[in-house]
A protein has these predicted regions:
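Transmembrane alpha-helical cores of Major Facilitator Superfamily
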Residues: 3, 30, 83-91
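Intracellular juxtamembrane helix-capping segments at the cytosolic ends
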Residues: 60-74
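Structural signature of the two symmetry-related core transmembrane helices
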Residues: 23-38
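Multi-pass alpha-helical transporter architecture, strongest
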Residues: 119-138
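Helix-breaking motifs and short loop linkers at transmembrane-helix boundaries and internal kinks
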Residues: 20, 42-43, 75
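Paired small-residue
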Residues: 46-54
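Residue-level signature of mid-helix packing/kink "hotspots" within the transmembrane helices
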Residues: 2-10, 93-94
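Interfacial helix-cap and linker-helix signal at transmembrane-aqueous boundaries
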Residues: 15-16, 100-109
């Protein structure tokens, strides 16, 4: 997970000037959705483990991409904007696992059900990128 997350960030760092951030984030969101579905629905633990690694690849750009998009959209956002982004990140880093844990507990400790519920987060990111695109076009 961590190695592929770092590889994703390094790839975008090297080739980002040639790649659309929106497109990269959309493709990463789709890969993240697919990896969450694979983790939660595949019956072979080995394939679920591969999906966990792919999840790392898919999430690598999400946090730095969000910062880049925010800085581009609000160039005078300053310290307050980054403080709010950090707060949002903290809420997400605690809220996501909390949701997964609650759903898992509702299903008798079935972590696969919790991970399946967690698919809502990359779906929300996908919707957010689409809304930003739509707002930019108008």
């Amino acid at each position: 997970f961590a190695v592929l997350m770092g590889a994703s960030r390094a790839f975008y760092g090297k080739y980002g000037d040639r790649i659309s951030l929106d497109r990269f984030m959309v493709l990463s969101s789709l890969l993240c959705i697919a990896s969450y579905l694979g983790i939660s629905l595949l019956g072979m633990p080995q394939l679920s483990l591969v999906c966990c690694a792919l999840c790392g690849l898919s999430v690598g750009i999400m946090w730095p991409g969000t910062f880049s998009k925010a800085a581009a959209a609000l160039p005078k956002g300053g310290t307050a904007m980054f403080a709010l982004l950090a707060l949002g990140g903290d809420v997400g880093c605690s809220g996501g696992p909390t949701l997964v844990g609650f759903v898992s507990e509702l299903f008798g400790g079935d972590l696969k059900k919790g991970i399946l519920a967690g698919v809502v987060f990359p779906v929300l990111l996908l919707l957010g990128v689409a809304l930003c695109r739509k707002g930019k076009e108008e």
